[in-house]
């Protein structure tokens, strides 16, 4: 009977063949493998209908390509914020929905969720993995939690205090260059170029206790870091190069690998030498003596770190964290400082008020140097920094891919597995949160005006359990560099308005050019 029933298919006796059954089982598994994500997308698309969305380009591309890394892209984000006010749905192709969020109340349940519930989305950051390894930026789960606990003491104010001297020294070197370049009265300078070298100079001294003199002469290591940042940003813009197989066959891919090797070799050599020194000079007691003398660098702190079970970090872990700090600490601070100087150049009345505040603080002090305790004595300068970070946040967005449904304040739900794109730029430019958001107004951060405002309205360093661990380091460096710069130079805007360019960090197309005029000793 079975033979008869299958004969219409032309199978005859072969219908009972175990090979055919195996083939059918394999086909069923393949079909399930294909259909399951499609069903998931279909189910999510139904659940996401409660989120409005702008018009798509077409059903294949979705919204892909509507936001470019350009001035126009940022203006488009501002139009989304004005239209949707809190959140909208965004389709990357036909299968990948993203919820873009730009209001503090809707950001809150995502960023304040436990780190294991709201891990960082790694779609973009995976390009950094060969360079940064499993450092805090890239790691997830238990490894991230363990490293975060172990690294938190590295950013205690007792560790950071001695770094202020480094910030002063590196800023002084930069200013000596500016004085030479402005010997005829003034000079037009690309702020990103000069300040990036200054922040890298500081970081090398704070992380490795190494002075490469990179502000005065070329450094292979510094050149490699700058090149890696450029290559990652460029790769992100070219979809075909997202495929590793293609990328590493290109000239850019080969340059990326070469620069990675150079950076890793430098960090590995420092770690090996430091461990050898520890063995020769008495091990952990040497580090404890350095800690007492307040001369620990970041590598020392990592070598001292132990988890709750007494287990130390491996050399590979130390390299990943050191490389991550070098990456995360130079570009963001350079972007922040460059845009702060731009905003003060456009508002000379605020620039002059900051200058007077610094002069009053350093009155009759020789040498003119900012100390740790001074950082809390510059309230207006701090307000100007914060307002610039609001208007021009170095990192314009962060992403989370939640492992469970996230319920928003109005009852809408972001389904598990859907990426949440938290627009720092959009939140900072949201007129429902910040009146006249395009106006540079430092008094927004006056103590009276801060009252009643959500702490998530201002998130240049992210927020929640995965916020920036080095934000105090960054703010301290910006305060020192800005205070000394305004004490010694008048900063004037270029005739041409810069076009913003969001990449890994917020840059300006062709650089951010400003005019600097040295102030006479009497004027200082």
Swiss-Prot record:
MF-aspect GO terms: heme binding; iron ion binding; long-chain fatty acid omega-1 hydroxylase activity
GO biological process, one term: leukotriene B4 metabolic process
Loss of function: phenotype: Mice are born at the expected Mendelian rate. No visible phenotype.
Pathways per UniProt: Lipid metabolism; leukotriene B4 degradation
Lineage top rank: taxon: Eukaryota
Induction of its expression: Up-regulated in bone marrow-derived dendritic cells by bacterial lipopolysaccharide (LPS), a ligand for toll-like receptor 4 (TLR4), and by poly(I:C), a ligand for TLR3.
Keyword Ion transport attached: no
Tissues expressed in: Highest level in polymorphonuclear leukocytes and dendritic cells. Detectable in lymph nodes, spleen, bone marrow and peripheral blood. Highly expressed in ovary. Very low level in liver, kidney, and smooth muscle. Expressed in neutrophils (at protein level).
Alphabetized InterPro entries for the sequence: Cyt_P450, Cyt_P450_CS, Cyt_P450_E_grp-I, Cyt_P450_sf, Cytochrome_P450_Monoox
Cofactor: heme
Physiological role: A cytochrome P450 monooxygenase involved in the metabolism of the pro-inflammatory lipid mediator leukotriene B4 (LTB4). Hydroxylates at the omega-1 and omega-2 positions LTB4. This oxidation step leads to LTB4 inactivation, which is postulated to be a crucial part of the resolution of inflammation. Mechanistically, uses molecular oxygen inserting one oxygen atom into a substrate, and reducing the second into a water molecule, with two electrons provided by NADPH via cytochrome P450 reductase (CPR; NADPH-ferrihemoprotein reductase).
Family: Belongs to the cytochrome P450 family.
Official protein name in the record: Cytochrome P450 4F3
């Amino acid at each position: 009977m079975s033979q008869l029933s299958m004969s219409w298919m032309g199978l005859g006796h072969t219908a009972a063949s175990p090979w055919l059954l195996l083939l059918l089982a394999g086909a069923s598994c393949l079909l399930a493998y294909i259909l399951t994500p499609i069903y998931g997308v279909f189910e999510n698309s139904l659940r996401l209908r409660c989120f409005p969305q702008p018009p798509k380009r077409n059903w294949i591309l979705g919204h892909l390509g509507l936001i470019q890394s350009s001035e126009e892209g940022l203006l488009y984000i501002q139009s989304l914020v004005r239209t949707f006010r809190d959140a909208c749905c965004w389709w990357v192709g036909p299968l990948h929905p993203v919820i873009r969020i730009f209001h503090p109340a809707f950001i809150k349940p995502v960023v304040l969720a436990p780190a294991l519930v709201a891990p960082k989305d790694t779609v973009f950051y995976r390009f950094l993995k060969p360079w940064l390894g499993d450092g805090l930026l890239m790691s997830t789960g238990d490894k991230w939690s363990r490293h975060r606990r172990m690294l938190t003491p590295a950013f205690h104010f007792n560790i950071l205090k001695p770094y202020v001297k480094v910030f002063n020294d590196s800023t002084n070197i930069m200013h000596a260059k500016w004085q030479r370049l402005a010997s005829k009265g003034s000079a037009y300078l690309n702020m990103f170029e000069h300040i990036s070298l200054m922040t890298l100079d500081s970081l090398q001294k704070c992380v490795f206790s190494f002075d490469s003199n990179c502000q005065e002469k070329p450094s292979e290591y510094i050149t490699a870091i700058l090149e890696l940042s450029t290559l990652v940003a460029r790769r992100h813009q070219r979809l075909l190069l997202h495929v590793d197989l293609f990328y590493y066959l290109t000239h850019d891919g080969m340059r990326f690998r070469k620069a990675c090797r150079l950076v890793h070799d430098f960090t590995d050599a420092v770690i090996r030498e430091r461990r050898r020194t520890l063995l020769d000079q008495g091990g952990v007691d040497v580090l404890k003596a350095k800690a007492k003398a307040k001369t620990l660098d970041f590598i020392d702190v990592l070598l001292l770190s132990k988890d709750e079970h007494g287990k130390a970090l491996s050399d590979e872990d130390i390299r990943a964290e050191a490389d991550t700090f070098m990456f995360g600490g130079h570009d963001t601070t350079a972007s922040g400082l460059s845009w702060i100087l731009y905003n003060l150049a456009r508002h000379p009345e605020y620039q002059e008020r900051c200058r007077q505040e610094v002069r009053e603080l350093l009155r009759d002090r020789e040498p003119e140097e900012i100390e740790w305790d001074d950082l809390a004595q510059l309230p207006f300068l701090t307000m100007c920094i914060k307002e610039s970070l609001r208007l021009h946040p170095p990192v314009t967005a962060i992403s989370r891919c939640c492992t469970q449904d996230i319920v928003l304040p109005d009852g809408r739900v972001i389904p598990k597995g859907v990426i949440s794109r938290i627009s720092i730029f959009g939140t900072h430019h949201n007129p429902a949160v910040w009146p006249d958001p395009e106006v540079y107004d430092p008094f927004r951060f006056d103590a009276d005006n801060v009252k009643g405002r959500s702490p998530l309205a201002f998130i240049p360093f992210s927020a929640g359990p995965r916020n920036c661990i080095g934000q105090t380091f960054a703010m301290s460096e910006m305060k020192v560099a800005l205070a000394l710069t305004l004490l010694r130079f008048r900063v004037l805007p270029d005739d041409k308005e810069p076009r913003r360019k969001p990449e890994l960090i917020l840059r300006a197309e062709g650089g951010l050019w400003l005019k600097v005029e040295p102030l006479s000793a009497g004027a200082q």
